Amino acid sequence: MKEKFKLTKLERNWILYDIANSAFTLLVSTLIPIYFNSLAGSAGVHEDMYLSYWGYAGSISTILVAIIAPICGTLSDRKFKKPIFLLTVLLGCAACAAMGLTTHWLLFLGIFVIAKVGFHSSIVFYDSMLPEITTDKRMDNVSSMGYAFGYIGSVIPFVACLVLVLFCDSFGMTMGGAMVCAFLITAAWWAILSLPLLRSYKQTAFVDGEGAPLKDSFKQLVRTFKEAKKEKHVFMYLIAFFFFINGVYTIIDMATAYGSALGLDTTGLLLALLLTQVVAFPCAIIFGRLSAKYDTGLLIKVCIVCYTCITVFGMFLVSLWQFWVLATLVGMFQGGIQALARSYLGKIIKPERSGEFYGLMDICGKGASFLGTTLVAFVSQITVGIEVNVFGLQLQNENLAVGSLVILFIIGYLVFCKADAMSKARV
């Protein structure tokens, strides 16, 4: 009889942080874009520009994280992983709570950028802990369970926030007041559930370093690139990751803004994205279980192909029921591709170099996110007022912008096939 998979205490605490930060991720992909559209609309910003400004804000945050990530990676591989991880968590939580302090749309975007920088910087440290808190054999399963419980756990604070926002009149509140409460609830959830990992994690894998870490960070980044180029399978994988995760992150970040820009019902959009979280929970666990039976590389290829099809479907989205279908399909593969991509890297690198390589992976991920959000924002902006008839459907600028992501999934798939073949040849 097969032994039941049981998590260790450290693995459980590591997964708890996924539950903690996923509350912010869910808020970013649901309520925050809608609230921003409300602020921008009240300030006289044209509705055709909502998606563009939102996309540019996401792009700015990813540029900043790409600059910071090498420093995070270098510090992570020394003996500073835990204290700097704490600082990034505090930055993200504080900025999240502060987002309710302004009703000026541009200042709101500025605070939002700071919150995203704190969030993504903490993820560099968090991901780099994975090779230390578990074994190679358990890594796929633990990584998948992190995403799975992150999806379902984040529903708890989100439902509380959603009830406050949708029924704010019944509570004697304005939408702005309800959003202030939503930001505070999310920040508190994020901070409190971070504590178990902060208390129990002890860094065991590190390299000795002398000199100033900040000064050495970008030198280390160059060395890491050179090391990755020597390890050609790692280098090719990071290139593939850059392209395929591009579409994944962009769809996550801009789903609500996309639906809102198309004029779809706000309540329906939020409930559909709540469905995404519920669907993602069992599907992420299933992918973790499948990784014990099937090759991780094969599963990643399946996810990329499915995401390509999802993007094509999303391009033709014109009604709410189609958004519900899109939300369900995204939920089926979102957790799987993120979890397997994270653990795949952990298997092909040395544990003591995990910080710098996961920092490099984060640069690739954020660079991809920058490319994706900028691409969507740019295409949306230059095609304002243009309608294209395809199969009898009138596609607007937002539809065309989403369709532009398909080519990146295709490139990611082709490069990953090459990288996976190279990795297998080394075994």
Across the structure, where does each feature detected by a protein language model lie?
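Juxtamembrane intracellular "pre-TM" segments in multi-pass secondary transporters
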Residues: 1-11, 202-238
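Helix-loop boundary and gating motifs at the non-cytosolic
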Residues: 5-62, 233-272
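A membrane-interface helix-boundary motif in multi-pass transporters
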Residues: 47-48, 165-188, 378-409
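Structural signature of the two symmetry-related core transmembrane helices
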Residues: 83-98, 298-313
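Helix-loop junctions at membrane interfaces in 12-TM secondary transporters
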Residues: 100-112, 315-327
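Multi-pass alpha-helical transporter architecture, strongest
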Residues: 189-200, 402-427
